[in-house]
Amino acid sequence: MLINFFSSIEVLFVIIKWILLLGYWWLITEVTIRILFKRRTVPSAMAWLLIIYVVPFIGAIIYLLLGELNLEKKRIKRSKIIWISALKKIKKLKNYKEIFTTKNSHIARSLFRLCKHRQGIGGVKSEKINILNDPDNVMQSVINDINLAKISIEMIFYIWHPGGWTNYVVEVLIKAANRGVKCRLILDSAGSKNFLKSIQVKIMRKSGIKIVEALNLNILQIFLRRMDLRQHRKMILIDNYIGYTGSMNMIDPKFFKKNRKIGEWIDIMIRMEGPVASAMRIIFSCDWEIETGENIFYAPYDTKKCNIIKKDNNYKTQVIPSGPGVSEGVIHQVLLTAIYSAKKILIMTTPYLVPSDDILHAICTASQRGVSVYIIIPKFIDSILVKWASRSFFSELLHAGVLIYQFEGGLLHTKSILVDDQLSLVGTVNLDMRSLWLNFEITLMVDNRNFGKKLKKIQTNYMSLSKVLHLKEWSKRPYWKRIIERFFYFFSPLL
């Protein structure tokens, strides 16, 4: 009897073993097929295959969580409907002919055409554009504009961190809401998680400020949506007339990540007046409706004010939103076209340098065909993974003649590109795969030499606070560092 019992247990264990083995192979086979049949770059596919075969079960789970661009079905359906509606709004905007640019420089012409074809809207004019590169000046300017707001204040931020200047912004927002100004905030659930749980948010909501938590982190949705898909835009809109965008989150650098020992974050923000704000607000209204279901679109820029923008010396701008469901891949196309458009000089600043193969080759080719190429990156960054992955690209860039400047004055967070002193791109997009293909981002393109000169002055100042990396010096680094670099290089398509 006892022998039969143990025999039955043994049979049961054998059955369980085979079930687990078959389940394991089914999972690996299923994930492998999904990787191979998804449209992705070869390096990305190879990196994922390595992960699931080196750490099979865990690797497969990681892929299901982070490897595919999944959104909830309801959100996908809502997004499509809203963006179709946005195209109709854009067509209405075309009736305001005075606000659109008709001529561009030879450097920018193809880029503006590309954006018009992909997004359905061409470049728009801006009456005034200022570059603000001092955080105190940025915050003071924002506070002044909020105090003068009469109709609406709308903001999108990835990070909203309390302390210092940010607390003053909260105070003036509450005052604005109390005097009848409509205030709407979209804050990313991950980047602003501490602020969203704070007492400040409760007070703001009581005063009438609407605050939406974008892409909510929910453990129940872990297999339905990528948790690392984030709302990475930084935008401020006031009265549908003033707009801000750039790389700066709603933070006071003196109070943000003080314990990381990497210095204060260095950013720029662009303040604009005029029709460009209407183009930016279409993006905000779509994001708001996707998150809340509320349609807040209203008439664009007041054409009665167009007596100024008819002049030829106004700024020609293009607002470029990017992210899932929003002209997918457009920002990658824009960056490639901008790099290939360079004839004399190309200056790029980015905190995270993990480019796609196409962008890497475009940068190297630009240098090899005689363009002076400068890349400014921070010497110290807040991500060990990105640090080593970035270093894996240095050799190829240096051999191509690209000058790499390592900024030592803090964490350089500015994302900017300047082409031949004429064409400028500033915004939230890092030179990494997450910004290029995953996150919701915004980029401002400006076709104006005076603006380019101002941006170049800031970039030149960054260079003065940087150390140039020389090929001879780089070639002497220890072999253990080279091994780590090559390891992270293989996984760079996933960062």
Curated annotation (Swiss-Prot):
Coiled coil: none annotated. The chain crosses the membrane at residues 9-29, 46-66. Pfam families: PLDc_2, PLDc_N. It is found in: Cell membrane. Catalyzes the reversible phosphatidyl group transfer from one phosphatidylglycerol molecule to another to form cardiolipin (CL) (diphosphatidylglycerol) and glycerol. Keywords: Cell membrane, Lipid biosynthesis, Lipid metabolism, Membrane, Phospholipid biosynthesis, Phospholipid metabolism, Repeat, Transferase, Transmembrane, Transmembrane helix. This is Cardiolipin synthase A. Its EC number is 2.7.8.-.
